[in-house]
Swiss-Prot record:
Catalytic activity: RNA(n+1) + phosphate = RNA(n) + a ribonucleoside 5'-diphosphate
Cofactor dependence: Mg(2+)
Organism whose genome encodes this protein: Streptococcus uberis (strain ATCC BAA-854 / 0140J)
EC number(s) per entry: 2.7.7.8
Name of the protein this chain belongs to: Polyribonucleotide nucleotidyltransferase
Matches recorded under HAMAP family: PNPase
Length: 732
């Protein structure tokens, strides 16, 4: 195929698609140019069905630093493991694509997005999502697309599609929504306490824009799309399925209805093991034993899947006996751990999360150096999911994509209520340890995080709670579930997480296993989630009504000093010598920003006070009118130099020593002598003039002879008048 180009304008920016020029050995490849962002997407499919009981789809989003004209950091100066943002973007693309493959599809699929040039005002992630769908759609890979995605902002009551960087910074909403022409199938959002009505409207506005992008894709597919390949789907033997269902469905139905998770798992596993043992013995000599046993396992999974869904949709009975809108038993506790800066333990049924707060100086913030300009990240929310939380053994190591994604969701939910840097000048880290899990552990970590922040004295604007909503749909009828547990998540059609305060939503995340959901379902799920969120907030506010007024004793205390920008070098010293000495003496941490704001951190208030003393003296300036007790350090013919404080000297000119004439400075002053002086001038170069005589009362001026004679005569006359008056009085 020769190169073909297609172009349109979307959200005020040119959108250009090129096919047929690069990556021609992939099943499908596109170059998408949106604004000045350029993304190459290549989609590849394996020749044969992969082994395993899952669909092996891999989506990568690779940030090349040259795309932004930057050198990679680190010693190797080469791109390494994906950044957190790249990992989250890969998940963002994976989630709407995955439901668009046929049930039973098991061929391995790789979709690789490479950012070749980067424009901060034209979303490269949205270009990559568009390119991923289009590369699959024009290829011979069986894909039930296309899909597309957009970002939605909300400024001054108006919705903005794919806002630029400045608009996103001003926006009350940061929403990514994806879907097909018919329906939405993925949502990811952070919001500044927006109402359910505004969020729903934003989703619908986003879907309208998505339809425009899908129409453009369909035009391209019609022009250059390949015929789809015939691919083997995983299908079980129909006769074998009918036999197992007839013999064991009643037993499995009974096992599924055991309310307690562990007991239910044991009961269902016992039925499955019985069936597997029977058929393994029955077909022990059959050369297709492996295929038969794979079918047996798949049939049992389908039977459990069907029974859980039937119970909910027909009998309105959930596996643990709850109503469809009922939350599991709740419990909340603060101060679970001593010594730490704050901790909260939140339990909902068999899901439990411990959140631990750590406060630190702003110098400990994470520096993010990706395709955007380098910036400091003040708030971190990390999520850990150990295998013991579900009673299993498994891999331990660095956080995987799921843990990174769940941590980011909690971060978005809680970030909206954090105090500003001016109100609370700390770097903040929350770590969520999932101790027990039976569904919706990410939302439990948000609730535990709220408890830890409030217990630690972080003045958040309002407590945040999260809840996960589920859906069981047969295409015609549907049931929305509140607070889904693991089994309902596994066999259900939707995982819709909603977090927020009493005033509004702060985060959304939705993933579905069907091709899309309607606005009616979204509206119902949001309303049901609000009711559940308020119930959880009642518990949180009962546990701790408001953030504590003080930090934990172990938390670092902070004090600040504002110094002139030109004094920063004095505090730091040559090669950091001065500041290092201060830190060595006091044991504090010191941060100085570009504006001259000095932040001092320590758990010891005395150390903070001493540090303030030292820094204040270093940057202190003599001011006109101030009086100092100074020491004479040098004597010259024209005057004496005195030390006012630290490295600040002043000149006392010979004429400023006394009101009477001073013949020789050395006759009056000597080196080492201490005197009081008053600053009378500071020039533009910082040179200080001081005066001793300004602190001495000025003696009266000498009087002239004529004035003295006149004054004497007047005094004599007054005295005579007084004597005459007294004589007259006596005679009377």
């Amino acid at each position: 195929m020769s190169k073909q180009t297609f172009s349109t304008t979307f959200a005020g920016k040119p959108l250009v698609v090129e096919v047929g020029q690069v990556a021609k050995q992939a099943n499908g490849a596109t170059v998408v140019r949106y604004g000045e962002s350029t993304v190459l997407t290549a989609a590849v499919m394996s020749k044969k069905m992969a082994t395993g009981d899952f669909f092996p789809l891999q989506v990568n989003y690779e940030e090349k630093m040259y795309a932004a004209g930057k050198f990679p950091g680190g010693f190797m100066k080469r791109e390494g493991r994906p950044s957190t943002d790249a990992t989250l973007t890969a998940r963002l693309i994976d989630r709407p694509i995955r439901p668009m493959f046929a049930e039973g599809f098991r061929n391995e699929i790789q979709v690789i997005n490479t950012v070749l040039s980067y424009d901060e005002n034209a979303s490269a992630p949205m270009a990559a999502m568009f390119g991923s769908s289009l590369a699959l759609s024009i290829s011979d890979i069986p894909f039930n697309g296309p899909i597309a995605g957009v970002q939605v902002g909300y400024i001054d009551g108006e919705f903005i599609i794919n806002p630029d960087k400045a608009q996103m910074e001003a926006s009350l909403l940061e929403l990514t929504v994806a879907g097909s022409k018919e329906a939405i199938n993925m949502v990811e959002s952070g919001a500044k306490e927006l109402s359910e009505d505004i969020m729903l409207e934003a989703l619908l506005k986003g879907h309208q824009a998505i339809q425009e992008l899908i129409a453009f894709q369909e035009e391209i597919v019609a022009a250059v799309g390949k015929e789809k390949a015939e691919v083997e789907l995983l299908q079980v033997d129909a006769d074998l399925q009918a036999e197992i269902v007839a013999k064991y469905n009643a037993d499995l139905q009974k096992a599924v209805q055991v309310e307690e998770k562990k007991a239910r798992e044991a009961a269902t596993e016992a039925v499955k093991e019985t069936v597997k043992a029977e058929y393994e013995a029955k077909f022990a000599e059959d050369e297709n034993l492996a295929t038969i046993m794979r079918d047996v396992a798949e049939i049992l999974e389908q039977m459990e899947h069907a029974e859980v869904r039937r119970l909910i949709t027909e009998d309105k009975v959930r596996p643990d006996g709850r109503k469809v809108d009922e939350i599991r038993p709740l419990d909340a506790q603060i101060d679970f751990l001593p010594k730490v800066h704050g901790s909260g333990l939140f339990t909902r049924g068999q899901t439990q999360a411990l959140s631990v707060l750590t406060l630190a100086p702003m110098g400990d913030t994470q520096i993010i150096d990706g395709l955007d300009d380098e910036y400091k990240k003040r708030f971190l929310h990390h999520y850990n999911f150990p295998q013991y939380s579900v009673g299993e053994t498994g891999r331990y190591g660095a956080a995987g994509r799921r843990e990174i994604g769940h941590g980011a969701l909690g971060e978005r939910a809680l970030e909206q209520v954090l105090p500003s840097l001016e109100e609370f000048p700390y770097a903040i880290r929350l770590v969520a340890e999932v101790l027990e899990s039976n569904g919706s552990s990410s939302q439990a970590s948000i609730c535990a995080g709220t408890l830890a922040l409030m217990a630690g004295g972080v003045p958040i604007k309002a407590p945040v709670a999260g809840i996960a909503m589920g859906l069981i749909s047969d295409g015609t009828n549907y049931t929305v579930l509140t607070d889904i547990q693991g089994l309902e998540d596994h066999f259900g059609d939707m995982d819709f997480k909603v977090a927020g305060t009493r005033d509004g939503i702060t985060a959304l995340q939705m993933d579905i296993k069907i091709e899309g959901i309607t606005p009616q379902i979204l509206e119902e799920a949001l309303a049901q989630a609000k009711k559940a969120r308020f119930e959880i907030l009642d518990l949180i506010e009962t546990t701790i009504p408001a953030p504590r007024p003080e930090l934990a004793p172990t938390a670092p205390k902070i004090d600040t000093i504002q110094i002139d920008v030109d004094k920063i070098k004095i505090v730091i010293g040559k090669g950091g010598e001065t500041i290092d000495k201060i830190i060595a003496e006091t044991g504090v941490k010191i941060d100085i920003d570009e504006e001259g704001l000095v932040q001092i951190f320590s758990s010891d208030q005395a150390a903070i006070d001493r540090t303030k003393e030292i820094i204040t003296s270093l940057v202190r300036e003599a001011k006109v009118g101030e009086v100092y007790h100074a020491k004479v350090v040098r004597i010259e013919k024209f005057g004496a130099f005195v030390n006012l404080f630290d490295k600040t000297d002043a000149l006392v000119h010979i004429s400023e020593i006394a009101w009477t004439r001073t013949a020789n400075v050395s006759d009056v002053l000597e080196v080492g002598e201490e005197v009081d002086v008053k600053v009378i001038k500071v020039d533009d170069k910082g040179r200080v003039d001081a005066s001793m005589k300004a602190l001495i009362p000025r003696p009266p001026k000498p009087e002239k002879k004529e004035e003295k004679a006149s004054e004497a005569k007047e005094a004599s006359n007054d005295q005579a008048s007084k004597s005459q008056s007294e004589t007259a009085s006596e005679e009377k």
